[in-house]
Every structure is written in structure tokens, then in C-alpha cells.
């Protein structure tokens, strides 16, 4: 089963359905349809860290909030972060995923913070010293596994 071939927009799998490679505009359009993503980085000792965060899209910047800790340390150091968002329907064997690479920075401008707060980015966990992080999209790619015909049968029940 081959899933990714550069410069090909469709890749056939052994299940008879094609995986669609998504262009930049489609990837950016899908991001705000989700509210949870995963931010990832590699620690100095070589371990991969991947943590869920709630986020909003502000133009082409992914914005999330955090408190003191590893995520904020890597932002301060200017390291490249990855960010993944997906929506999957296991019962239908369909879904999409978007992967972003970029650098992040703390958002400190009161005007930017006010605008972000209007986008309703509320933390799920209480943060003592909440910091907004903006991840600039340097590279973005995505794939979609569409629902394939004949897979699902719907049965209506009479009232």
C-alpha cells in the first residue's frame, strides 16, 4: 500500500479508494473546522513530544495558549514546531489530516491579544500565567481519505 507520492494528487491504496493530497488553500480552509490540534517538537535529548492543544486560526497563523513549560521554552528558543490537525470518521473509514511546520513566537501586543480573545480561544485547563503563541505556517500539507461509494448502508426506522 503506497500512501504518499510527491507531485501526485491521488494515490491508490489496496482498499480501492484513493488518498487525495490537499493543496495549501484546502489545508488552510480545513484548519478552522477543528478545535483541537497537536503541537510537536523534539527535546534536546532526542525525544519526540506531542501534546494536544485547542487553537484558532488567525489569518495564516495558528494560535494556541500555554503556560510555563516545555512548549514555551521551545518557542523562546525559536525552534521549529510541528502542528497536526485531523478529523476522522472511523465508522466510515474516511477523514483528513493537515500537517504544519513553522516557527512560533509569543504574542505580546495588546491589540493582537484582544483580537485573539474575540476568536474565543479559551483554555480547557486553568493557566496561571497564560501566554498566547502564534505558529507561522512555513510548510503545510494534507491528505484526505474520502468516503468511498457503497461502503455505508443507511436504514431508516419507521416511527
What spans do the regions from the language model cover?
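Charged, gly/pro-rich active-site loop segments
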Residues: 2-19, 87-159
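Short, basic/aromatic recognition patches
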Residues: 11-38
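Short beta-strand segments
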Residues: 34-67
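Short beta-turn/strand-loop junction motif enriched in small, turn-promoting residues
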Residues: 36, 44, 69, 88-90, ...
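Short glycine/proline-enriched turns and hinge-like loops at secondary-structure junctions
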Residues: 48-50, 75-76, 93-97
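A short mixed-secondary-structure module that forms the rim of ligand-binding clefts
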Residues: 54-90
Amino acid at each position: 500500500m503506497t500512501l504518499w507520492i510527491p507531485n501526485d494528487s491521488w494515490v491508490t491504496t489496496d482498499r480501492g479508494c484513493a488518498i487525495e493530497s490537499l493543496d495549501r488553500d484546502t489545508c488552510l480552509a480545513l484548519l478552522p473546522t477543528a478545535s483541537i490540534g497537536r503541537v510537536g517538537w523534539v527535546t534536546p535529548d532526542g525525544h519526540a513530544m506531542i501534546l494536544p492543544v485547542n487553537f484558532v486560526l488567525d489569518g495564516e497563523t495558528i494560535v494556541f495558549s500555554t503556560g510555563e513549560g516545555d512548549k514555551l521554552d521551545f518557542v523562546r528558543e525559536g525552534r521549529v514546531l510541528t502542528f497536526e490537525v485531523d478529523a476522522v470518521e472511523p465508522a466510515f473509514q474516511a477523514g483528513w489530516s493537515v500537517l504544519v511546520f513553522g516557527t512560533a513566537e509569543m504574542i505580546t501586543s495588546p491589540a493582537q491579544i484582544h483580537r485573539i480573545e474575540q476568536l474565543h480561544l479559551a483554555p480547557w485547563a486553568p493557566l496561571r500565567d497564560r501566554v498566547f503563541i502564534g505558529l507561522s505556517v512555513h510548510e503545510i500539507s494534507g491528505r484526505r481519505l474520502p468516503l468511498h461509494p457503497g461502503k455505508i448502508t443507511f436504514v431508516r426506522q419507521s416511527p
